[in-house]
Amino acid sequence: ARSQNGVDGWQIDSQPTLMPSPKEYPEEIWGIEDPRITFVPELQQYVVTYTSFSRGGPGVSLALTKDFRTFERYGVIMPPDDKDTALLPRRIDGYWALIHRPMTKLGAHMWISYSPDLHHWGRHRLMLEARRGAWWDANKIGLSPPPIETSRGWLVFYHGVRHTPS
């Protein structure tokens, strides 16, 4: 959907804004979902992180756009099993920072990873663990909207699952 002012007068597009492209990006063979959009002033573009699905499971893919009509796709940047991803809107100590939720032997926790170029990611660090016990977020946690920078630090919202999504 598009609007001149972002408040009213919305026009629904006849086609989805970003469609899977499995011939060029085989990790999208079973579809794409769950985009997180971050405007990055340094790039003067929007960075869209999204979940791409293939036989290997959900992975994290990234695309850049200025107009939401054309996209420069980077393809998969975090291999399966990973999702719930967003980029911070500015570099941290010279590196791009990405919050994501890989499924590891440790569980479904939130991690932060760093990249010099948005292609190559490393310095993976556990950021927030799902709680143990009967809490609403005791089994899995994941990032909700992209982080918001405040005068007191980064505000991060997350969702959680105890045993099942319902």
Please state what every model-predicted region is.
Residues 144-146:
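Active-site/ligand-binding surface loops and adjacent short beta/alpha elements
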Residues 1-30, 39-139, 148-166:
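Beta-rich carbohydrate-recognition and catalytic domains
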